[in-house]
Amino acid sequence: MLGKIVTIAAVAAGGMILSKQLRKSRESGKATIEESIEVNVPVSAAYNQWTQFEEFPNFMKNICEVRQLDDTHLHWRAEIAGKEEEWDAEITEQIPDERIAWHSTSGAEHAGVVTFHKISDSTTRIMLQMDYSPKGFIEGLGDAVGAVKLQVRTDLQGFKDFLEAHGSETGGWRGSVARH
């Protein structure tokens, strides 16, 4: 009997937390994710690989395609919540070995920054912050239960595994984009 009461209480508490998260997401319209990972490569290798956007489908499960249109514009195609989505993004700042910032210009509304921090000559901490606006009930629910945060964490782990397995970056763009 006590076990049933504890289970019912846990389900009720979980429902209250989920309801609160859904309400918070709906009220603000925005959600923020912050994740980091340490990669066993020099900072230049981590940064260079991150600039190879067209390689993202190799380690980001939901990304189907990324086309780099020019130095600052990308077209993305992904599967989100079981349906295909497309959007364009603009790189708003790029400093070699330090940071890359972006925002969407069409489709799913989001913006973010990824930064690269030298831990040692052979270890880099990658920190990602992304703000986005979940669309509709399914994406809002995914946000509320932490599915998007888990996907970002999985994608960062995929990047780490991809880069460490290759031993070095597959290319790199060392140009800068002034903040705008």
Which sequence ranges carry the predicted segments?
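Beta-strand/loop substructures that line and gate deep hydrophobic ligand-binding cavities in soluble
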Residues: 2-5, 93, 103-161, 165, ...
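Hydrophobic ligand-binding cavity/cleft-lining segments
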Residues: 3-77, 158, 164-167, 178-180
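Intrinsic-disorder/low-complexity, polar/charged segments enriched in Ser/Thr/Lys/Arg/Asp/Glu/Gln
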Residues: 30-36, 73, 86, 99, ...
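Organelle targeting or membrane-anchoring low-complexity regions in eukaryotic organelle proteins
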Residues: 68-71, 79, 127, 150
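Short, hydrophobic/aromatic-rich segments at coil-to-beta transitions
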Residues: 68-75, 94-102
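Short acidic, glycine-rich loop/turn motifs
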Residues: 78-82, 104-106
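Short, cysteine-centered beta-strand-loop-beta hairpins and adjacent loop/turn segments enriched
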Residues: 81-85, 134-137
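Phosphoinositide-binding peripheral membrane targeting modules
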Residues: 88-90
